[in-house]
């Protein structure tokens, strides 16, 4: 869906469901 999750993942993890870490931001498929 939307490529931007509005979350950063500098620590390496994303808390938003359906989002994965594409450092340094979380992205959605």
UniProtKB/Swiss-Prot annotation:
<feature type="disulfide bond">
    <location>
        <begin position="5"/>
        <end position="19"/>
    </location>
</feature>
<keyword id="KW-1015">Disulfide bond</keyword>
<dbReference type="GO" id="GO:0006952">
    <property type="term" value="P:defense response"/>
</dbReference>
<feature type="disulfide bond">
    <location>
        <begin position="14"/>
        <end position="26"/>
    </location>
</feature>
<comment type="similarity">
    <text>Belongs to the cyclotide family. Moebius subfamily.</text>
</comment>
<feature type="cross-link" description="Cyclopeptide (Gly-Asn)">
    <location>
        <begin position="1"/>
        <end position="29"/>
    </location>
</feature>
<feature type="disulfide bond">
    <location>
        <begin position="9"/>
        <end position="21"/>
    </location>
</feature>
<keyword id="KW-0960">Knottin</keyword>
<keyword id="KW-0611">Plant defense</keyword>
<dbReference type="InterPro" id="IPR036146">
    <property type="entry name" value="Cyclotide_sf"/>
</dbReference>
<dbReference type="Pfam" id="PF03784">
    <property type="entry name" value="Cyclotide"/>
</dbReference>
<protein>
    <recommendedName>
        <fullName>Varv peptide E</fullName>
    </recommendedName>
</protein>
<dbReference type="InterPro" id="IPR012324">
    <property type="entry name" value="Cyclotide_moebius_CS"/>
</dbReference>
<dbReference type="InterPro" id="IPR005535">
    <property type="entry name" value="Cyclotide"/>
</dbReference>
<comment type="function">
    <text>Probably participates in a plant defense mechanism. Has cytotoxic activity against human lymphoma U-937 GTB and human myeloma RPMI-8226/s cell lines.</text>
</comment>
């Amino acid at each position: 869906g939307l490529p931007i999750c509005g979350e950063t993942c500098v620590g390496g993890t994303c808390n938003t469901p359906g989002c994965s870490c594409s450092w340094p931001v979380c992205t959605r498929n």
